[in-house]
């Protein structure tokens, strides 16, 4: 398992600050949910954590090593990334996509070993796409593509996984199976989610983003209050407990005209 920390992380485009002084941590073996409305900075933060973009200021660390000091191969051997929308050549098979997860452990011209093949087989089985392994990428549904990408990530045998809206395109069964699976992995997960009930049920820790800033962070039970959800999302909600599991439950009641956060931005523009 590994630890990810971000300190004083900021990022801008054409003078517009999209992330502002972000502080967050994902500790060994925990699932950390990034929550917030569209445009709040969740995907941008994940790209900075993955090293796909460099911050204007601040530092990302894996354990005690700065991301800047980790080579690409060293990072790929410990970190897997599952993005929202991934394209692949139409004629690549599901199995070939998953085999890409073994690339960091092979020489440039080396063939897959029997050990690699066993890892790929296990990853295909674990996310329920083994029966589709010979199908072409372009024939898959959105949910099947998402599960194939997760299998590719598992084939890396990572210490950390970053996932951007992994439940998008998935039916209810596969949403639950995917998040159940994350809970069984011996890895540290940072996952961007829209569904607050899934976050409350599966995340050990949540970070609430709005307008590129951290609004609050902590356990779902302490952070996901009716007041915060109205402020950030602009909806009135009822917070209670699901009677069977005892998990925190969010029931959406009505949209409000203007969120407190957005009014504050208008009153004090940056």
Q: What do the PLM-derived regions correspond to, one by one?
A:
Residues 155-159:
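A short, proline-enriched helix->beta-strand linker immediately N-terminal to the Walker B motif
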Residues 232-270:
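ABC ATPase nucleotide-binding domains
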Residues 35-37:
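The feature captures the beta-strand-to-loop junction immediately N-terminal to the Walker
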Residues 50:
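Helix-to-loop junction immediately C-terminal to a conserved catalytic motif
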């Amino acid at each position: 398992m590994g630890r990810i920390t971000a300190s004083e992380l900021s990022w801008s485009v054409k003078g517009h600050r999209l992330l502002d002084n972000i502080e967050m941590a994902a500790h060994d073996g925990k699932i950390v949910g990034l929550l917030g409305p569209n445009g709040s900075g969740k995907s941008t933060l994940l790209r900075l954590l993955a090293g796909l973009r460099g911050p204007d200021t601040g530092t990302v660390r894996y354990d005690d090593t700065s991301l800047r000091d980790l080579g690409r191969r060293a990072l790929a051997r410990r970190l897997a990334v599952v993005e929202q929308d991934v394209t692949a050549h139409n004629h690549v098979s599901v199995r070939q996509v998953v085999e890409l997860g073994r690339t960091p452990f092979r020489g440039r011209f080396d063939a897959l070993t029997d050990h690699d093949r066993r890892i790929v087989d296990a990853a295909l089985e674990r996310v329920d796409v083994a029966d589709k392994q010979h199908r072409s990428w372009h024939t898959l549904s959105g949910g099947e593509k998402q599960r194939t990408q997760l299998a590719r990530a598992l084939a890396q045998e990572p210490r950390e996984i970053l996932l951007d809206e992994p439940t998008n395109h998935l039916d209810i069964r596969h949403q639950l199976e995917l998040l159940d699976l994350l809970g069984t992995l011996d890895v540290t997960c940072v996952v961007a989610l829209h569904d607050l009930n899934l976050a409350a049920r599966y995340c050990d820790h949540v970070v609430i983003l709005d307008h590129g800033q951290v609004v609050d962070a902590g356990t779902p039970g302490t952070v996901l209050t009716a007041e915060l959800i109205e402020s950030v999302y602009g909806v009135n909600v009822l917070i209670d407990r699901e009677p069977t599991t005892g998990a925190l439950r969010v029931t959406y009641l009505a949209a409000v005209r203007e969120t407190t956060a957005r009014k504050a931005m208008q009153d004090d523009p940056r």
